[in-house]
């Protein structure tokens, strides 16, 4: 089964083809993928402009599909099914991918299925060289979401904790903006932090000892006050690097301690981390160090699959389609969608 995956939930236009026949050859099933990022488009505004994102998806979907088919050396008539991101995300951006995918499926007379964006992220480490086995705890951490999920099987998701305000990735973006760094903030903060002292400034870790929920709004305020009150924060590169490193350390420390607590609470021994922030090297290294102390392992998606991409949608779509799930012909998107509301796959 060849499944075309379409990802248009925010500011990346991602297309990929998952081919189940490749699994028999010991491969991960990914036949090919293409990804277009709108970073340059939104950088001027310091963040994603929803209307511009939607219009750019419309411009890119057809040429990217042509590029993908050429890369995979197949025709569109060889596509057996289509999976598109149904939510959560920006409603206009979601609708562009959903309408394109559903229309293409209708024209090809193949099934189409809407996929939960965060389920795509959660399953993406299964495409990696060291895939986890169910059950596991998953940390889903991105610009729009931060949550801990106990995954007992595909569709069997229990939310253990989530952010009650800002997502970790959003906090990175806001801190970057305060430091005068360009969009997207996460990679630029991490780059600046490499030259800084992570212990130079003590920043709060809100809700660190209160269950498994997260809160990052207080940390954002603390960074704002630190920048305002610290001489040289606007022109001394070492001071700026120390602030970035201290901020990154505080966020990572919070995420890691919550992950350790979740593993101990559930008794599980595998942690899966996915989403854009999962590419952060300091987070990966700290998780590996701390999880080794409790006899647990950590699994990541390949770096190219940490950001939004079509491969994770194609794979999630394949899993649900081959289990017999079908969607109605109507097109509907869900900008706010709880992952625990997804149906479990029939065993």
Swiss-Prot record:
It catalyses: L-threonylcarbamoyladenylate + adenosine(37) in tRNA = N(6)-L-threonylcarbamoyladenosine(37) in tRNA + AMP + H(+). One of its GO terms (biological process) is tRNA threonylcarbamoyladenosine modification. Belongs to the KAE1 / TsaD family. This is tRNA N6-adenosine threonylcarbamoyltransferase. One of its GO terms (molecular function) is iron ion binding. NCBIfam families: gcp_kae1, T6A_TsaD_YgjD. The gene is tsaD. Transmembrane segments: none annotated. HAMAP family: TsaD. It comes from Psychrobacter sp. (strain PRwf-1). The lineage of its organism: Bacteria, Pseudomonadati, Pseudomonadota, Gammaproteobacteria, Moraxellales. Fe cation binds at residues 117, 121, 308. InterPro entries: ATPase_NBD, Gcp-like_dom, KAE1/TsaD, Peptidase_M22_CS, TsaD.
């Amino acid at each position: 089964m060849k499944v075309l995956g379409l990802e248009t939930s925010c500011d990346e236009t991602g297309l990929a083809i998952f081919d189940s026949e490749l699994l028999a050859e010991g491969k991960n099933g990914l036949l090919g993928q293409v990804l277009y990022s709108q970073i340059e488009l939104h950088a001027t505004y310091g963040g994603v402009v929803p209307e511009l994102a939607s219009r750019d998806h419309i411009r890119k979907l057809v040429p990217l599909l042509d590029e993908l088919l050429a890369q995979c050396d197949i025709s569109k008539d060889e596509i057996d099914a289509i999976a598109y991101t149904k939510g959560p995300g920006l409603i206009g951006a979601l609708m562009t991918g959903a309408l394109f995918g559903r229309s293409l499926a209708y024209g090809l007379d193949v099934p189409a299925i809407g996929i939960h964006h965060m389920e795509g992220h959660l399953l993406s480490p299964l495409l990696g060289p060291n895939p986890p086995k169910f059950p596991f705890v998953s940390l889903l951490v991105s610009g729009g979401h931060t949550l801990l999920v106990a995954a007992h099987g595909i569709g069997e998701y229990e939310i253990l904790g989530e952010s009650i305000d800002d997502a970790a990735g959003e906090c990175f973006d806001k801190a970057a903006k305060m430091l005068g760094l360009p969009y997207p903030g996460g990679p630029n903060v991490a780059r600046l932090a490499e030259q800084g002292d992570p212990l130079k400034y003590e920043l709060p870790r809100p809700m660190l000892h209160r269950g498994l929920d997260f809160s990052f709004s207080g940390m954002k305020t603390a960074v704002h006050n630190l920048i305002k009150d610290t001489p040289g924060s606007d022109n001394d590169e070492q001071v700026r690097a120390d602030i970035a490193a201290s901020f990154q350390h505080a966020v990572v420390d919070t995420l890691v301690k919550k992950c350790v607590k979740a593993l101990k609470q559930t008794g599980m021994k595998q942690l899966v981390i996915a989403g854009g922030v999962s590419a952060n090297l300091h987070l990966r290294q700290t998780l590996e160090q701390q999880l080794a102390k409790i006899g647990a392992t950590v699994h990541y998606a390949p770096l190219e699959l940490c950001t939004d991409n079509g491969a994770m949608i194609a794979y999630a779509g394949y899993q649900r389609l081959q289990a017999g799930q079908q969607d109605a012909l109507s097109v509907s998107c869900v900008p706010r969608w709880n992952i625990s509301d997804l149906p479990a796959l029939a065993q």
